[in-house]
């Protein structure tokens, strides 16, 4: 193996070990402007996009001890390395993909030490985020409380109006 390839292999191995997860993508019709915009959007979620040679990537995966299905990796291969939250990175990829007419295809991924197929990564990306789940829980808890307050308020106003009517009769 040439020295350049060995350095590239070491670099990819380091990125795999430093990341919380990664997403394997096939990209179609990607211009330089799309690539730059995609990379910029990923930087907001502590992730980066790399275009890699398949052989180098799968060799790095093998040396890191990961086993990802490589049967459907025809075409150009891109990898999103997520250094903070792999789910947020997957959501960002999905949002970008919707914006640019499905120019990215999920092939596989590794999120929270679980190997996932492309469909599974896409399903994870469609799940609500922790922030959204917290907001939904707060909404579920707040709704009954506001109803109780409303019922108590109407009951109290009924008692007050009854007392008011009694005092006006006398």
Curated annotation (Swiss-Prot):
Coiled coil: none
Recorded superkingdom: Bacteria
GO cellular component: large ribosomal subunit
InterPro entries: Ribosomal_uL10, Ribosomal_uL10-like_sf, Ribosomal_uL10_bac, Ribosomal_uL10_bac_type, Ribosomal_uL10_CS_bac
SUPFAM superfamilies: Ribosomal protein L10-like
CDD domains to which the protein is assigned, alphabetical: Ribosomal_L10
Any single biological process term in GO: translation
GO molecular function: large ribosomal subunit rRNA binding; structural constituent of ribosome
Keywords: Ribonucleoprotein, Ribosomal protein, RNA-binding, rRNA-binding
Keyword RNA-binding (UniProt): yes
Job description of the protein: Forms part of the ribosomal stalk, playing a central role in the interaction of the ribosome with GTP-bound translation factors.
Family under the similarity heading: Belongs to the universal ribosomal protein uL10 family.
Protein name: Large ribosomal subunit protein uL10
């Amino acid at each position: 193996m040439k020295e350049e390839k060995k350095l590239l292999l070491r670099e990819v191995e380091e990125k795999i070990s430093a990341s919380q997860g990664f997403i394997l993508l096939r990209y179609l019709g990607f211009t330089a402007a799309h690539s730059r915009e995609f990379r910029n959007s990923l930087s907001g979620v502590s992730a980066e996009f790399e275009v890699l040679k398949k052989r180098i990537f799968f060799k790095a995966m093998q040396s890191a001890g990961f086993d990802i299905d490589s049967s459907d990796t025809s075409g150009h291969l891109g990898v999103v390395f997520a250094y903070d939250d792999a789910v947020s990175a997957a959501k960002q990829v999905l949002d970008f993909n919707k914006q640019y007419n499905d120019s990215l295809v999920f092939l596989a991924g590794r999120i929270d030490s679980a190997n996932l197929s492309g469909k599974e990564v896409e399903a994870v990306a469609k799940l609500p985020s922790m922030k959204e789940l917290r907001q939904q829980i707060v909404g579920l808890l707040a709704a009954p409380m506001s109803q109780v307050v409303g019922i108590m308020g109407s009951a109290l106003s009924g008692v007050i109006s009854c007392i008011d009517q009694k005092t006006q009769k006398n």
